[in-house]
Amino acid sequence: MLKEEYNLSGADNMASAELSFKKQKVVLKKFMIAQVTKGIMQRYASLLVTMPSDDDNAIIGTNHLKTTKFLEIILHRAKSSHLQFKKVCCIVIKFLDCCSKETNYMKFLKFSLHKLFVAAFILSVPNVVGDDRDRITTRDETYHLYSQITGLPLEEVINCCSIVRPVLIRRSRQQRRQMLSRREQHSYFLRSSFMNSNSSASPFFSTNRSADDLHVHTRAYSLHSHSDGEGQDRRSEHEETHSMGADADTYRQTTFIPDTPNGLHSRSLIECGIEPTQVSDSGEWSGQSNGYVLVTELQEFNKMGKKLVQEAFRIV
């Protein structure tokens, strides 16, 4: 079938296999974009309208295909990697989850899921290189780039990011404190067990631990180099980090390599105490990140994507 479609001869078996692989990648890409978009709109439909509607299907039916096409266009124009798409989805889900548990911040985005995705794309671009001037320059270039890609006015792009960014920062700080708290509790448990070898294992530290618990000994990622260019926010975070003398060894210094605004990278495993050589697909990970997405969140997204593919396709 593929041979007839591309008018290939028998001598072009290798080219045929390559085309087949590319075609499969395109199919999977479109499938994931459509499924993730539909899933987000189903789960958070009540947050995406001015007045809650009893007929969520009407909302999904109206906007699902349009939003899917919108994402495909941005991914193509920005030449985004698979990793950036994952980070964008994690950012969108994290923001909407905060909206469902706190205040519906979508009202400041005019309930536009498209604007949220634009902000997520921009915030997924690493901007941790150099001093404040360098980061501000990179940030402004990224604003201009995605303004041209999406057609949104520059002021609108900046406004969307200024709404989404603080919510992500606050949530990420909460997650970091929780990780530190669990690490301290685990350290206390180990010390207690060492001092009292006859004591039974605590029921609060069972072998069935969550994904976040597996990272209690890892570095709580730094937020002092966010791309917002606000020096005070970084200084306060820097002071908070250095006030934890007992945890100083858990913080690693990472060397970052400059890149262009659309040179998209993953969140550093080094920031979580994992060496790059420990990762099977080391090309997907690098040392640059704004810290908006946890490694565990990316892992959960990967599991979700794998499950969707297994349910929808026959793996041969």
Curated annotation (Swiss-Prot):
Basic and acidic residues: bias regions: 225-242
Annotated region described as Disordered, given as residue ranges: 223-263
Name of the protein in its database record: Uncharacterized protein YPL039W
Organism: Saccharomyces cerevisiae (strain ATCC 204508 / S288c) (Baker's yeast)
